[in-house]
Amino acid sequence: MTVYHFVGIKGTGMSPLAQILHDTGYQVQGSDIEKQIFTQAALEKRNIPIYPFSADNIKPGLTVIAGNAFPDSHPEIAKALAEGIPVIRYHKFLAEYMKKYTSVAVTGAHGKTSTTGLLAHVMQQAKPTSFLIGDGTGRGNESSEYFVFEACEYRRHFLSYQPDYAIMTNIDFDHPDYFANIDDVFDAFQNMALQVNKGIIACGDDEYLPKIHANVPVVYYGTGEENDFQARNIVKNTEGTTFDVFVRNTFYDTFYIPAYGHHNVLNSLAVIALCHYEEIDVNMIKLGLESFGGVKRRFNEKVIGSQVLIDDYAHHPTEIKVTIEAARQKYPEREIIAVFQPHTFTRTQSFLDEFAESLSAADRVYLCDIFGSARENVGKLTITDLQEKIANAELIEENDTSVLKAHEGAVLIFMGAGDIQKYMRAYENVIA
């Protein structure tokens, strides 16, 4: 049997795919940078070998699965190609692998990871389900009927897939280094819709998704009356959220989620709609929703002394807005502090005013230096350009986070898609 070698095994898609193959009996190994990344814990738990990048890793008998971030000139990929060792790109391999299951793609500008995690958790209550979540979590089950996976629109990667179902959470302008404008983003989702084989579950409250055309049924969810699945009588409190679901204006059931913010009602509705479509028992759905513990880097809380520290992946103005709203729902009496690290110069430049507006919903804002991606690293913009647009915003350094101690009893939300976690760890060390 071949050994699958992952070039870039710590990637947020690559790591869960390696976990899935391992769980279903394949021999797996991989290589990556030596820096500790949150996606590697699950690999280490399974004793999957992780090597530093080196052409010496490439040997006969391997099948190389190459991460999208690495060109054919990468030493390992180049050697494999030169020696006739099979090389398959991540999305091509995944597209072929999922064909043996009923596949569900979860896509959208925001909410992909949380919705994928929730759907996988709920479906597992009823049927064996394999899943690939963009927080680095994957699980394979040889007897699975379903394969639930996160599908990203960036560089139109999701057009590699032809899933049975697709959940579309929303369409928004992001990834300005690739997409020209919102119409370009819509075009990508429209093309994706035409590749779905059985049905699409889409948010009808979204500005753009109702304009999608497809060759399969499109079921809409949301709070608007025109939706097929509608949430009514939404009650939000410090313990979570309760709401009634009506299916085409007929009462279906009442649901409770231990989650906060309107976006989590919509994510739950998407899951309820798909499970209803697949005739999964409503009690199984309710059990799954009520017992879901969340996904990595999405509103992950830690209480230290009088403060609540929250780690969140929010890196777009829309995501920052809903994360702060969720914190206010759960902690209405507390001061909300935003500690934000912008991710990529292009995104920061494109949404400078929107970032300022979203962050201003917090009671106080602290800003970290811009995290440049591997694709750019430098830009003319600096963090002070954002600071100047936010009243009383302060800059914060990893080696000097002690200023946060002044906010006794506050909720501190550390937000970003880069290495914002190192700032949170640094602060934890200060107050330990």
Swiss-Prot record:
Its EC number is 6.3.2.8. It comes from the Bacteria. Keywords: ATP-binding, Cell cycle, Cell division, Cell shape, Cell wall biogenesis/degradation, Cytoplasm, Ligase, Nucleotide-binding, Peptidoglycan synthesis. ATP binds at residues 108-114. InterPro entries: Mur-like_cat_sf, Mur_ligase_C, Mur_ligase_C_dom_sf, Mur_ligase_cen, Mur_ligase_N, MurCDEF_pg_biosynth, UDP-N-AcMur_Ala_ligase_MurC. It is found in: Cytoplasm. It catalyses: UDP-N-acetyl-alpha-D-muramate + L-alanine + ATP = UDP-N-acetyl-alpha-D-muramoyl-L-alanine + ADP + phosphate + H(+). The keyword GTP-binding does not apply. SUPFAM superfamilies: MurCD N-terminal domain, MurD-like peptide ligases, catalytic domain, MurD-like peptide ligases, peptide-binding domain. One of its GO terms (cellular component) is cytoplasm. Pfam families: Mur_ligase (PF01225), Mur_ligase_C (PF02875), Mur_ligase_M (PF08245). One of its GO terms (molecular function) is UDP-N-acetylmuramate-L-alanine ligase activity. Belongs to the MurCDEF family. Cell wall formation. This is UDP-N-acetylmuramate--L-alanine ligase. It comes from Bacillus velezensis (strain DSM 23117 / BGSC 10A6 / LMG 26770 / FZB42) (Bacillus amyloliquefaciens subsp. plantarum).
